[in-house]
Curated annotation (Swiss-Prot):
Name by which UniProt lists this protein: Gamma-aminobutyric acid receptor subunit beta-1
Free-text note regarding domains: GABAARs subunits share a common topological structure: a peptide sequence made up of a long extracellular N-terminal, four transmembrane domains, intracellular or cytoplasmic domain located between the third and the fourth transmembrane domains.
Membrane topology: Multi-pass membrane protein
Main location: membrane
One Pfam family per UniProt: Neur_chan_memb
GO MF annotation: an example: monoatomic anion channel activity
Gene name in the database record: Gabrb1
UniProt superkingdom: Eukaryota
Species whose genome carries this gene: Rattus norvegicus
Residue ranges annotated as Extracellular topological domain: 26-245
Glycosylation site residues: 33, 105, 174
């Protein structure tokens, strides 16, 4: 009984040991062990000529490109460029690197890439680029059994982006990344987007502080140079600028400063210190805003949209200051002098009228006329020449330049009566004509100038804003 139980327990314990021995024997014969892989890599690199492309003398090598965009770090209007960090992958087939016996892909150390042929790819519009090197150089080389090579890099590049800033900051920009072969022509190498529309990834995850990526487009083409035709791939980003920052930093302050300059129209015109200080402060503030904006933009020859708005605000602020200069000139300057002179002329005329109303009579009862009265009477007699009698002469000459008025005849009385009846008719016509005239503000009245400015400036500025935003906002 004991013997049978010992045999059964011994059989149960020996079964796992036998399975382990079989597995060890199988693993010792596995061709993917370290020694076999080492021999395979040594065999692939032995006699490999890095100077010759795959299928040298045969058809061109097809190189597929894939880009995973990690971030767009900066878009600079001053330097006309943008900075892009990406995972850049290239794949091609090299029959010299095909192997068998190992059903696995071989991911090798990045230093092996220096011993293999790789495409001479470069970025056409590159200004400054580098491959990240922390903690080691960020390169990947992976071999497939059929000889396909996958070569990956983590690159940060600063690429040129020519911008049209005529509609800045209500603009859209198109920034591209141009990928091209430097030395190999289309007879030796061809580029294509590996994966079609899915060759570029990560764009939808990018968030920029001043831009929104509206769309991106991939293009494959050939370019002709004197040395031949070269393959080129283009990745273009359509960037739309976010207006929120500029509304808060530029448009709203400029608008409020312009409105603030109109406060002077409600300040009394004799408060020179207050109105001048307010006008100069608003002008200097607008100048500061414009100067700060120009420092953040390149020196370009054309006018930008924001320049037009700031210039319009500056003109309104400056005109508000000039309006007080005009009011001050009317109130304290030449205007009062003209008013004083007109008052003196009016008093002189009234004095002359009083003197003319004084009647002088000689000893014979004749009325004495002065030289001014003679002229007035003469002009009146010329008008009534047609109805007067040549025999009824109203004046007689005296060497003392004093004239004697004789009694009027019936015809003279008729003429004077006609003249008296004609004057009221002319007065009625003049009154009716004055009623038809449009009321025009008196520019010599300082209160009227300020009153009209309170309406003119806001209405004109509102029309300016309506035209501006309708034109520049799509």
């Amino acid at each position: 009984m004991w013997t049978v139980q010992n045999r059964e327990s011994l059989g149960l314990l020996s079964f796992p040991v036998m399975v382990a021995m079989v597995c060890c024997a199988h693993s010792s014969n596995e061709p993917s062990n370290m020694s076999y892989v080492k021999e395979t890599v040594d065999r692939l690199l032995k006699g490999y000529d890095i100077r010759l492309r795959p299928d040298f003398g045969g058809p061109p090598v097809d190189v597929g490109m894939r880009i995973d965009v990690a971030s767009i770090d900066m878009v600079s209007e001053v330097n006309m460029d943008y900075t892009l960090t990406m995972y850049f992958q290239q794949s091609w087939k090299d029959k010299r690197l095909s192997y068998s016996g190992i059903p696995l892909n071989l991911t090798l150390d990045n230093r092996v890439a220096d011993q293999l042929w790789v495409p001479d790819t470069y970025f056409l519009n590159d200004k400054k680029s580098f491959v990240h090197g922390v903690t080691v150089k960020n390169r990947m080389i992976r071999l497939h059994p059929d000889g396909t090579v996958l070569y990956g890099l983590r690159i940060t590049t600063t690429a040129a982006c020519m911008m049209d800033l005529r509609r800045y900051p209500l603009d859209e920009q198109n920034c591209t990344l141009e990928i091209e072969s430097y030395g190999y022509t289309t007879d030796d190498i061809e580029f294509y987007w590996n994966g079609g529309e899915g060759a570029v990834t990560g764009v939808n995850k990018i968030e920029l502080p001043q831009f929104s990526i509206v769309d991106y487009k991939m293009v494959s083409k050939k370019v002709e140079f004197t040395t031949g035709a070269y393959p080129r791939l283009s990745l273009s980003f359509r960037l739309k600028r976010n207006i929120g920052y500029f509304i808060l930093q530029t448009y709203m302050p400029s608008t409020l400063i312009t409105i603030l300059s109109w406060v002077s129209f409600w300040i009394n015109y004799d408060a020179s210190a207050a109105r001048v200080a307010l006008g100069i402060t608003t002008v200097l503030t607008m100048t500061t805003i414009s100067t700060h904006l120009r420092e953040t933009l390149p020196k370009i020859p054309y006018v930008k949209a924001i320049d037009i708005y700031l210039m319009g605000c500056f003109v309104f602020v400056f005109l508000a200051l000039l309006e007080y200069a005009f009011v001050n000139y009317i109130f304290f300057g030449k205007g009062p002098q003209k008013k004083g002179a007109s008052k003196q002329d009016q008093s002189a005329n009234e004095k002359n009228k009083l003197e003319m109303n004084k009647v002088q009579v000689d000893a014979h009862g004749n009325i004495l006329l002065s030289t001014l009265e003679i002229r007035n009477e003469t002009s009146g007699s010329e008008v009534l020449t047609g109805v007067s009698d040549p025999k009824a002469t109203m004046y007689s000459y005296d060497s003392a330049s004093i004239q004697y008025r004789k009694p009027l005849s019936s015809r003279e009385g008729f003429g004077r009566g006609l003249d008296r009846h004609g004057v009221p008719g002319k007065g009625r016509i003049r009154r009716r004509a004055s009623q038809l005239k449009v009321k025009i503000p008196d520019l010599t009245d300082v209160n009227s100038i300020d009153k009209w400015s309170r309406m003119f400036f806001p209405i004109t500025f509102s029309l300016f804003n309506v035209v501006y935003w309708l034109y520049y906002v799509h």
